[in-house]
């Protein structure tokens, strides 16, 4: 991923499925550790379909959004905040769970497809663009464990303790380079995320 001078104005949009009701499920992994990001003036606003807060990260004032919608309707919240604060897709960071990455792994990506992720599909549809930045938190795929269960059941299940620890570690590493991410220094952020090899390989 090449470096860029784009600074993010919305960081992070965290998408999951009724987080307060499903704190122990795999899908909720992207929310773990969000309390470590300063969130002054937190407010719930119906027109934003979620909790919104302003914060300063890495010298940049950003908007934090935690949608309260179903995960597959997350785009409604993202589009509402984007329109109200005049934020372009390239200035948005979405943190989400990633089946195609093993637990303990976090990666950055600019644009691209949804890879079957219903939350991303909704955001792309509502924004009319896929050019936002993604912070992908690995949760693994059921096939990694030779589990014969549907993906939908897997992401709603309780992760094993080992995976919980790996996911938590990946999120902490992501938070350690949040300044670089927000300021647009993606090359440096990726270097930090890649410092340690995938613990499951």
Where are the model-predicted features located?
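Conserved TIR/SEFIR loop-to-helix hotspot centered on a Trp-containing motif
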Residues: 114
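Nucleotide and nucleotide-moiety/phosphate-recognizing core
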Residues: 1-111, 121-136, 142-153, 157, ...
